[in-house]
Amino acid sequence: MNKDLLHTPVLVDQVIKYLIVNPSGIFVDGTLGGGGHSFEILKRLKLGGRLIGIDWDDVAIEKARQRLQAFKNQVLIKKGNFANLTEILAAEKIDKVDGILLDLGLSSFHIDVPERGFSYLSDGPLDMRMSKDSKRTAADILSNESESQLAWIFYNYGEERRSRAIARTVVKNRQQKRLETTKQFTEIIKSVTPYSQRIKTLSRCYQAVRIATNGELDNLQTFLDQSIDLLHFSARLVIISFHSLEDRLVKNFLAKQVNPCECPPELPYCVCNKKPTMKLLTRKVVTPSIEEIKLNKRSRSSKLRAAERI
């Protein structure tokens, strides 16, 4: 595959369709990455439109800054995490915005750089931090957490059925030598996994440790809990997820905003007086076309959900 294609943002047409209602408004790309989605959004904004791009990875910020140079008067790039969006916007004296986008997938400069430690396909340090400012690495988790906690991580963040066996083997191996490389971790997983199931098990375990290292699900939930108050009426929320744990959080959150009633089903009418705050724009999850998957294989597991503030 052409290297440039690895930086191609996913579901671009769908993002634009659901996100931009007011081209003169203020939009947030909470997962700036290399600036792919932001570039497409900025191309469609009017002169009064603005975009705030947020990322906590210095490499991503530098790549995005270069890519978005032509729009420097309309884009503001901030280092931070979307979980802190309220504070980030408040620092810019912004109360509400017209649209927020999150693309929760890994960028190629995470996956393809062995030194970042995100992939089992090459040997590198067990890092997995999205931000170098974070103190705890994947090696710290695998070397210090208890066997029961490791099993919990593999099961709950990776949905891995062999969670206990893998955790037990991690602990056994680290008693001999501290786990510091992806090769060590990969060999441990392989040692307790049938050959035919190794790829999926490796993917699940690496996902689990990455989520634990970066607090990804906690950050997503924190963002969701504040997102409603940051959106103007008729503003849009668009989220692209890449695994079932993220998608489940988003789906359940949107369902609660669309139908917040807590009354017992046997009551003939609502008495709790809780009103919907959002309207679903995607009744079914939006996935990439066959053509897009052919061009960008990493788009194949992407799922988009969108809603409008009411």
Describe the role of every protein-language-model region.
Residues 1-310:
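S-adenosyl-L-methionine-dependent methyltransferase catalytic core, i.e., the SAM/SAH-binding region
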